[in-house]
């Protein structure tokens, strides 16, 4: 993959007023309670391909996720903020409303340790808002059920 810093990547990412299937809805820098602030995996993968071999990995099993990580391929997974239970709210999406996950959060998985059954997580939000480590290990028993809520993911090969 091409070298690009996070700020440049986020600044150039496609944006959309409200639809995460068309681009990042809202701002990647500021929370906005009125919008579903995210970008869906297919659009993120499409954008990411300009930097390297990136693919929408949504719908894949936990075992497939682990295989990618054990092959050295990082994977963006959509889980929940602070690993909390999922909760939902209704958002205006143009001319209609949709009930969507409210506490959505995306993190980068950098590895998997099959001996400890833990994932190596890169989470810049963890530093900014919690004063915690950028990289940390998360138990599979916490991560996997949250991944399986939607099975949204993007792999970088």
Roles of regions detected by a PLM:
Residues 1-65, 70-73, 151:
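Cysteine-nucleophile protease catalytic domains, especially the papain-like/related folds used
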Residues 14-19, 60-63, 81-85, 114-115, ...:
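Solvent-exposed loop/turn segments at secondary-structure junctions
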Residues 57, 101-104:
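Short, glycine/acidic-rich beta->alpha junctions
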Residues 62-63, 94-95, 106-107:
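A generic local structural motif
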Residues 73, 103-105, 117:
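Envelope-exposed proteins and targeting segments
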Residues 75-79:
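A short, Trp-centered hydrophobic/proline-enriched beta-strand micro-motif
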Residues 85, 89-101, 110-157:
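Noncatalytic regulatory segments and standalone regulatory/sensor domains
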């Amino acid at each position: 993959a091409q070298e690009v810093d996070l700020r440049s990547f986020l600044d150039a990412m496609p944006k959309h007023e409200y639809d995460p299937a068309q681009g990042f809805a809202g701002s990647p820098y500021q929370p906005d309670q009125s919008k579903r602030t995210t970008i869906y995996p297919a659009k993120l993968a499409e954008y990411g391909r300009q930097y390297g071999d990136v693919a929408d990995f949504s719908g894949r099993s936990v075992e497939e996720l682990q295989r990618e990580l054990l092959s050295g391929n990082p994977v963006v997974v959509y889980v929940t903020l602070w690993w909390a239970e999922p909760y939902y709210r209704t958002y205006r999406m143009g001319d209609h409303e949709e009930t969507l996950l409210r506490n959505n959060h995306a993190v980068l998985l950098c590895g998997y340790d099959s001996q400890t059954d833990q994932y190596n997580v890169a989470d810049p939000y963890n530093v900014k808002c919690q004063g915690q480590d950028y990289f940390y290990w998360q138990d599979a028993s916490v991560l996997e059920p949250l991944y399986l809520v939607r099975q949204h993911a993007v792999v970088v090969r």
